[in-house]
Structures are given as structure tokens and as C-alpha cells.
């Protein structure tokens, strides 16, 4: 289980690093408003990844709740972005997907042989 917790921590750290780097790039290239929209989505993605990790920890328990709260988080983020005039929908959506970068990083690290893994 320690290996799982280490993986979970790594994924959260990589997601946070990607969030900071992309936030700075978006702020530099576009505007603070667009960057704030991205940041809101990225924070939602971090929360989603954390909730997903907690759900994986509970695999095998008798409860059968299929991620309704995780879906609700995504829906609330998108509705908030659509309704609030200061937020932009696309940066919020792309920010939410930032956690996928950490998953791709982990997959590539596991698939591509390195000197450590050989």
C-alpha cells in the first residue's frame, strides 16, 4: 500500500507542477482573467484526482457508489464557468484536464525503459 500512496503523491505533485507552469504561460500569453479561469479548472482537476485516489482506496468495499460526486464536481465547474461572466469556459475545461498530463507522464515513465528500470 505504501507504493500506492507514493504513486498517488507523485501524480498530485506532477499535476501541481504542470498547473503552476501552465498558469504562468497562460497569464503571460493571454490575460490574468484567462489564467484565473485555467487555474480554477486545474484546481478542480486536482480535487478530482484526489477524489479518484480515495475511490481506488475503497475498492472492494460493499458500497456501490459510482463516482457521482466526481461527476458533480465536473458539472459544477462547467456550469460555474458558463454562468459567471468573468470566467471563460474553454480554459476551465482545459484546466480540469491538466491532471491527465500526470497520468500520461506516469504511463510514459512506466513504458519507456530507462537505466533505472533496466
From Swiss-Prot:
One of its GO terms (cellular component) is proton-transporting ATP synthase complex. Pfam families: CGL160_C. GO terms for biological process: proton transmembrane transport. It is found in: Cell membrane. The chain crosses the membrane at residues 11-31, 73-93, 94-114. It is a multi-pass membrane protein. Belongs to the bacterial AtpI family. This is ATP synthase protein I. It comes from Synechococcus sp. (strain ATCC 27144 / PCC 6301 / SAUG 1402/1). The gene is atpI.
